[in-house]
Amino acid sequence: RICDTAIVYTITLETNDTMKLTGFADEASRDLATQIKATKELGWTAISARMIGDRNIHEMPEADFEKAADQLDEAGIVIPELGSLIANWGKTIDSDFGIALGEIERCIPRMQRLGTKMVRVMSYAQNPWGEDQNETERFRRLREIVKRFADAGLTTVHENCMNWGGFSSEHSLRLVEEVPGLKLVFDTGNPVFQRDRSKPQADGTFPWQDAFEFWKAVREHVIHIHVKDCQNPISDDVE
């Protein structure tokens, strides 16, 4: 632990059946020097990058990014995954798609500078259940997102979170079906606090998602895993 905060660790699944450990070092600190220190204390050489200071890597001023990239190089730390803000749970499907396109434009050269091959995206925020989820537009946007990264030789992975693909394992699998080239990052903690919208009950309710069942359903499409310690919600009316 650094700064009384633990790093959430992640796993990259390699094609030769090996696993490489990395972590969300911004869970330890937003300060890059402390992120590097925390990573090295664990004996790791990789960070799953999101925030440095108060900004995501693809939103940092150019001079600040170059300084950070040099620090990482000097420390011998690599970045296998960039956790972007693209189409994340904080953006609705009716938001301007130009926002995502701008993020992609800034993200690609920074991934290339860092030698990062994998970018984490989402499928936009969940609309309240029962309302139109605008699936067609979600698929259209994600196809364009994946294509732009693929054209640069980069792999796009979708995380099951508070987004459309996080409604259930069936929703995540539908994304893979509808969006050629899309891979998955599986988060072990996110199913715990969400209802499984693929399993309506007779009384109109939905059961809590089962993380292990979710994993078994999507595993053949997963190339990266977020491992979290998580508790079930304390009340059935809290999601």
Predicted regions and their residues:
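Alpha-helical scaffolding within the catalytic cores
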Residues: 32-35, 63-68, 209-213
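Acidic/histidine-rich catalytic cores of soluble enzymes
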Residues: 82, 146-239
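Glycine-rich, proline-tolerant flexible connector loops at the mouths of alpha/beta enzymes
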Residues: 48-69, 125-129
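Flexible loop residues that form catalytic
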Residues: 52, 87, 124, 189, ...
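Hydrophobic faces of well-ordered beta-strands that scaffold small-molecule active sites
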Residues: 20-25, 47-49, 79-84, 119-121, ...
